[in-house]
Regions:
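Catalytic beta/alpha-barrel core
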Residues: 11-21, 31-59, 64-77, 91-102, ...
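Short, acidic/polar
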Residues: 1-7, 39-44, 75-86
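A short acidic, amphipathic alpha-helical/loop segment
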Residues: 2-3, 22-26, 57-61, 107, ...
Length: 167
Protein backbone atom coordinates (compact mmCIF):
# COMPACT_ATOMS: atom_id res chain seq x y z
CA UNK A 1 0.00 0.00 0.00
CA UNK A 2 2.82 2.40 0.81
CA UNK A 3 4.43 1.69 -2.57
CA UNK A 4 1.15 2.36 -4.34
CA UNK A 5 0.59 5.62 -2.48
CA UNK A 6 4.11 6.77 -3.35
CA UNK A 7 3.68 5.89 -7.03
CA UNK A 8 2.27 8.06 -9.80
CA UNK A 9 -0.77 5.80 -10.19
CA UNK A 10 -4.11 7.43 -10.99
CA UNK A 11 -5.92 5.19 -8.52
CA UNK A 12 -4.88 2.54 -6.00
CA UNK A 13 -6.45 -0.68 -4.77
CA UNK A 14 -6.23 -1.64 -1.10
CA UNK A 15 -6.94 -5.36 -0.65
CA UNK A 16 -8.21 -6.03 2.84
CA UNK A 17 -7.64 -9.76 2.38
CA UNK A 18 -3.93 -8.82 2.34
CA UNK A 19 -4.01 -5.95 4.88
CA UNK A 20 -5.94 -5.41 8.10
CA UNK A 21 -6.70 -1.69 7.68
CA UNK A 22 -7.01 1.04 5.06
CA UNK A 23 -3.82 3.13 5.16
CA UNK A 24 -3.79 6.85 4.53
CA UNK A 25 -3.87 7.19 0.75
CA UNK A 26 -3.10 10.89 0.68
CA UNK A 27 -6.32 11.70 -1.14
CA UNK A 28 -5.68 9.35 -4.07
CA UNK A 29 -8.76 7.77 -5.60
CA UNK A 30 -9.01 4.36 -3.98
CA UNK A 31 -10.67 0.99 -4.46
CA UNK A 32 -10.97 -0.92 -1.18
CA UNK A 33 -11.42 -4.61 -1.92
CA UNK A 34 -13.15 -6.92 0.55
CA UNK A 35 -12.73 -10.61 -0.33
CA UNK A 36 -13.86 -11.94 3.06
CA UNK A 37 -17.12 -10.01 3.56
CA UNK A 38 -17.84 -6.29 3.70
CA UNK A 39 -17.11 -4.46 6.97
CA UNK A 40 -17.87 -0.73 6.85
CA UNK A 41 -16.00 -0.19 10.14
CA UNK A 42 -12.71 -0.76 8.28
CA UNK A 43 -13.28 2.25 6.02
CA UNK A 44 -11.82 5.58 7.12
CA UNK A 45 -14.23 8.42 7.95
CA UNK A 46 -15.23 10.36 4.87
CA UNK A 47 -14.13 7.57 2.50
CA UNK A 48 -14.77 8.71 -1.06
CA UNK A 49 -13.63 5.85 -3.26
CA UNK A 50 -14.98 2.54 -4.47
CA UNK A 51 -15.69 -0.61 -2.51
CA UNK A 52 -15.23 -3.96 -4.29
CA UNK A 53 -17.15 -6.74 -2.56
CA UNK A 54 -16.95 -9.53 -5.10
CA UNK A 55 -20.47 -10.59 -5.98
CA UNK A 56 -21.91 -9.79 -2.55
CA UNK A 57 -24.92 -7.46 -2.73
CA UNK A 58 -24.59 -4.33 -0.61
CA UNK A 59 -27.29 -2.06 0.73
CA UNK A 60 -27.05 1.54 -0.44
CA UNK A 61 -24.54 3.03 2.00
CA UNK A 62 -23.61 6.06 -0.06
CA UNK A 63 -20.37 4.57 -1.41
CA UNK A 64 -19.66 3.72 -5.04
CA UNK A 65 -19.49 -0.05 -5.50
CA UNK A 66 -17.74 -2.52 -7.77
CA UNK A 67 -19.00 -6.08 -8.07
CA UNK A 68 -16.39 -8.48 -9.37
CA UNK A 69 -16.24 -12.01 -10.68
CA UNK A 70 -12.95 -13.86 -11.21
CA UNK A 71 -12.67 -17.15 -13.09
CA UNK A 72 -9.18 -18.63 -12.93
CA UNK A 73 -10.37 -21.73 -14.80
CA UNK A 74 -11.17 -20.12 -18.12
CA UNK A 75 -13.48 -17.77 -19.97
CA UNK A 76 -17.22 -18.39 -20.43
CA UNK A 77 -19.03 -17.41 -23.62
CA UNK A 78 -19.47 -13.71 -24.33
CA UNK A 79 -23.23 -14.09 -23.72
CA UNK A 80 -22.55 -15.56 -20.27
CA UNK A 81 -20.11 -12.74 -19.44
CA UNK A 82 -22.65 -10.09 -20.47
CA UNK A 83 -25.50 -11.75 -18.55
CA UNK A 84 -23.45 -12.12 -15.36
CA UNK A 85 -21.99 -8.60 -15.38
CA UNK A 86 -25.27 -6.90 -16.32
CA UNK A 87 -26.97 -8.65 -13.34
CA UNK A 88 -24.48 -7.21 -10.87
CA UNK A 89 -26.04 -4.62 -8.58
CA UNK A 90 -23.20 -2.13 -8.43
CA UNK A 91 -21.93 1.03 -10.05
CA UNK A 92 -19.23 -0.87 -11.96
CA UNK A 93 -19.17 -4.55 -12.93
CA UNK A 94 -15.78 -6.25 -13.15
CA UNK A 95 -15.08 -9.56 -14.85
CA UNK A 96 -11.63 -11.16 -14.91
CA UNK A 97 -11.20 -14.40 -16.84
CA UNK A 98 -8.24 -16.68 -17.48
CA UNK A 99 -7.50 -16.65 -21.22
CA UNK A 100 -6.38 -20.06 -22.48
CA UNK A 101 -6.62 -19.45 -26.23
CA UNK A 102 -7.75 -17.00 -28.91
CA UNK A 103 -11.38 -18.14 -28.54
CA UNK A 104 -11.34 -17.02 -24.89
CA UNK A 105 -9.78 -13.70 -25.86
CA UNK A 106 -12.42 -13.19 -28.56
CA UNK A 107 -15.15 -13.90 -25.99
CA UNK A 108 -13.92 -11.08 -23.78
CA UNK A 109 -13.68 -8.69 -26.73
CA UNK A 110 -17.19 -9.64 -27.92
CA UNK A 111 -18.66 -9.15 -24.45
CA UNK A 112 -17.50 -5.55 -24.20
CA UNK A 113 -19.89 -4.29 -26.89
CA UNK A 114 -23.29 -5.29 -25.50
CA UNK A 115 -22.56 -4.56 -21.82
CA UNK A 116 -25.13 -2.07 -20.56
CA UNK A 117 -23.31 -0.84 -17.47
CA UNK A 118 -19.97 0.66 -16.59
CA UNK A 119 -17.42 -2.11 -16.47
CA UNK A 120 -13.90 -3.45 -16.27
CA UNK A 121 -13.20 -6.56 -18.37
CA UNK A 122 -9.83 -8.23 -17.94
CA UNK A 123 -8.09 -11.29 -19.28
CA UNK A 124 -5.73 -13.11 -16.94
CA UNK A 125 -2.65 -15.10 -17.93
CA UNK A 126 -0.10 -14.40 -20.67
CA UNK A 127 -2.72 -14.31 -23.43
CA UNK A 128 -4.95 -11.99 -21.40
CA UNK A 129 -2.32 -9.29 -20.92
CA UNK A 130 -3.44 -7.51 -24.10
CA UNK A 131 -6.79 -6.70 -22.43
CA UNK A 132 -4.90 -4.74 -19.80
CA UNK A 133 -2.88 -2.84 -22.41
CA UNK A 134 -5.81 -2.11 -24.75
CA UNK A 135 -8.33 -1.57 -21.98
CA UNK A 136 -9.95 1.43 -23.67
CA UNK A 137 -10.87 -0.81 -26.64
CA UNK A 138 -13.01 -2.79 -24.19
CA UNK A 139 -14.70 0.35 -22.85
CA UNK A 140 -13.19 -0.21 -19.42
CA UNK A 141 -13.51 2.45 -16.75
CA UNK A 142 -9.95 1.64 -15.64
CA UNK A 143 -7.47 -1.21 -15.49
CA UNK A 144 -5.17 -2.72 -12.88
CA UNK A 145 -1.36 -2.70 -12.71
CA UNK A 146 0.96 -3.57 -9.83
CA UNK A 147 3.71 -1.58 -8.13
CA UNK A 148 5.25 -4.47 -6.20
CA UNK A 149 4.21 -8.03 -6.94
CA UNK A 150 1.43 -8.99 -9.38
CA UNK A 151 -1.87 -9.95 -7.77
CA UNK A 152 -3.22 -11.71 -10.86
CA UNK A 153 -1.68 -13.73 -13.71
CA UNK A 154 -0.76 -11.48 -16.65
CA UNK A 155 -0.87 -8.27 -14.64
CA UNK A 156 1.75 -5.75 -15.75
CA UNK A 157 3.61 -3.32 -13.53
CA UNK A 158 2.65 0.34 -13.46
CA UNK A 159 6.05 1.09 -15.01
CA UNK A 160 5.35 -1.30 -17.91
CA UNK A 161 1.89 0.20 -18.44
CA UNK A 162 3.28 3.75 -18.47
CA UNK A 163 5.98 2.71 -20.98
CA UNK A 164 3.27 1.31 -23.27
CA UNK A 165 1.27 4.55 -23.09
CA UNK A 166 -2.38 5.29 -22.39
CA UNK A 167 -4.59 2.89 -24.29
Amino acid sequence: ADLACASDADMIEIRLDLLDHVPDTGGMETVVTFRNGFDASLLPKGFNGYVDVGEEALPDIGIRTISSHHDFGGTPSSAEIVARLDRMESDIAKGAYFVRDFRDLAGILEASGPLKKEHVLLGMGPMGTITRIRQSTLGNNFTFAHVGEPTAPGQLSLEEMRALGEN
